[in-house]
Amino acid sequence: MKHYAIQPANLEFNAEGTPVSRDFDDVYFSNDNGLEETRYVFLGGNQLEARFPEHPHPLFVVAESGFGTGLNFLTLWQAFDQFREAHPQAQLQRLHFISFEKFPLARADLALAHHHWPELAPWAEQLQAQWPMPLPGCHRLLFDEGHVTLDLWFGDINELTSQLDDSLNQKVDAWFLDGFAPAKNPDMWTQNLFKAMARLARPGGTLATFTSAGFVRRGLQEAGFSMQKRKGFGRKREMLCGVMEQTLPLPCSTPWFNRTGSNKQEAAIIGGGIASALLSLALLRRGWQVTLYCADEAPALGASGNRQGALYPLLSKHDEALNRFFSNAFTFARRFYDQLPVKFDHDWCGVTQLGWDEKSQHKIAQMLSMDLPAELAVAVEANAVEQITGVATNCSGITYPEGGWLCPAELTRNVLELAQQQGLQIRYQHQLQDLSRKDDGWLLNFAGDQQATHSVVVLANGHQISRFSQTSSLPVYSVAGQVSHIPTTPELAKLKQVLCYDGYLTPQNPANQHHCIGASYHRGSEDTAYSEDDQQQNRQRLIDCFPQAQWAKAVDVSDKEARCGVRCATRDHLPMVGNVPDYDATLVEYASLAEKKDEAVSAPVYDDLFMFAALGSRGLCSAPLCAEILAAQMSEEPIPMDASTLAALNPNRLWVRKLLKGKAVKAG
């Protein structure tokens, strides 16, 4: 999946106020009564009113081939809300809607189109508020405290469905085959699409479409659906409905990156920082019973304990996986934090990354050449930096207007309090010593001869993750760093944005009139003692990067206020999220992987043991989406990420890449 800005819809509104695509010369919905047509064709054609009360699972998954104005989604959301109100004790509690859109509407056009349906306004306004920026890939939107999830995939549906992870196979309960008419948009209505629909459909899953075109009916039958005609809506004579009445054989395309979940719904999380806090929320939302074990006497005493941390994406022209992950993680994080019903100090003031030397200027120029949407990142010339940031630096750079800063410690503490209100159990001063399989679960041995057993375990304990026999071979490393807390000055108080250079400097937090400046970097160290050298170096790096800035020289670190923490990182700068891989079994099973890919078995992992680690210095950006990915995987639900990016997050990735090339693998 190439990283490029998605092209917005090219449309106009006709005399009836209906949006019409200029490119496809077709309406987005019926001039007569688009809302009733949606109810008849898609909700009625899939028999959803009758199926919801009898659905045997807590989640119902709908997929759609063209999002357009979101009419189908909004109509279904309204119907689902009405169902939940009428059937509060039903097994079905959550709706998951997956849709693909090559040319998404601009937010203003979306709002204008929604004026047609005032009865949908309560739902339409929520969609407009979370409408994502035009970036390729999956945008997960959470509504109604997670009872409704929308996965919006921006890009060509035929390309995107070929890039979906195998974990989405046979997950879709109902398909809405929608879009511009086949005669207007033949490129979408392909046999490849029909085959993808069949691959994703659950046995017994259904489909409905407004068209009755013969090639569509025959193509869906060839793909595996049993098809029938039904009376069309209004003046349309016929439409098509279908059922997946068979279980298609679906071999795993990349078994070495296969992800497995669990049906046990009970887990222990080891940790006490932002990763474990956000994962707790994500699992509780899915009905899990969760117990958190924290080694310290309180949360956020490790790497998540800083006063201020910057939120902005990590981009690189030469690393597609990095771009795909962090651009979508960043936009998800902003939506997630804005929705969180907890208080924490933050300011979405923007982040400006400056080119202080030739190397950093070249890196920024490469990022700006990637055709990024202006909502994500824009160039800023040296003479405009002072106006944007409030301070003079004599450097040009790149600005992330949606970025900013937040207090990780406060966020972590308050998210855990929220999770406790939802049923989370927390055990402090529980230092995990080791874990082993017992019966159908895990036996946890803690310091002080304390024990516990759990069905599923997630290791989210930062740099301590590799201290167990199951994880000792993981290629992760510790990084100790010191952040200095400096009092504001009249000049520093002018700083309006987070500055990033060969370090970073935050605007003052109004709650304490202090800034954060940092951070030192000591790879392989776990030393958390205060360092006067680090304190001075944090100040000196700022001065060295902006030698003409008098305000930088006035930075005062003499009061020795600082915080030292230890991060867990990987050499490819991406987190490790998923099953804990079995190192020894991987080397045995994949000894001949380079020559025998076709014979490869599923990735050797420890059953019901997962990990959420190596967030590095971008945990505030990556943690919300990673928590959502892991909770979805564990719950065997659709994952909001394409297969190749998921592979880049797999904890076994560095070993497997070498084995695929026939190279030797070393532990650590």
Swiss-Prot record:
Subcellular location: Cytoplasm
Official protein name in the record: tRNA 5-methylaminomethyl-2-thiouridine biosynthesis bifunctional protein MnmC
Organism superkingdom: Bacteria
Keywords, ordered alphabetically: Cytoplasm, FAD, Flavoprotein, Methyltransferase, Multifunctional enzyme, Oxidoreductase, S-adenosyl-L-methionine, Transferase, tRNA processing
Protein family per UniProt: In the N-terminal section; belongs to the methyltransferase superfamily. tRNA (mnm(5)s(2)U34)-methyltransferase family. In the C-terminal section; belongs to the DAO family.
Annotated region (tRNA (mnm(5)s(2)U34)-methyltransferase), positions in chain: 1-245
A Pfam short name: Methyltransf_30
Naturally occurring in which organism (per UniProt): Escherichia coli (strain SMS-3-5 / SECEC)
UniProt main location, coarse: cytoplasm
GO biological process: one example: tRNA wobble uridine modification
Cofactor: FAD
Region (FAD-dependent cmnm(5)s(2)U34 oxidoreductase): 270-668
Function summary: Catalyzes the last two steps in the biosynthesis of 5-methylaminomethyl-2-thiouridine (mnm(5)s(2)U) at the wobble position (U34) in tRNA. Catalyzes the FAD-dependent demodification of cmnm(5)s(2)U34 to nm(5)s(2)U34, followed by the transfer of a methyl group from S-adenosyl-L-methionine to nm(5)s(2)U34, to form mnm(5)s(2)U34.
One GO cellular component term: cytoplasm
EC number: 2.1.1.61, 1.5.-.-
GO MF annotations, alphabetized: flavin adenine dinucleotide binding; oxidoreductase activity, acting on the CH-NH group of donors; tRNA (5-methylaminomethyl-2-thiouridylate)(34)-methyltransferase activity
Reaction catalysis annotation: 5-aminomethyl-2-thiouridine(34) in tRNA + S-adenosyl-L-methionine = 5-methylaminomethyl-2-thiouridine(34) in tRNA + S-adenosyl-L-homocysteine + H(+)
Gene: mnmC
Xref: InterPro entries: FAD-dep_OxRdtase, FAD/NAD-bd_sf, MnmC-like_methylTransf, SAM-dependent_MTases_sf, tRNA_MAMT_biosynth_bifunc_MnmC, tRNA_MNMC2, tRNA_S-uridine_synth_MnmC_C
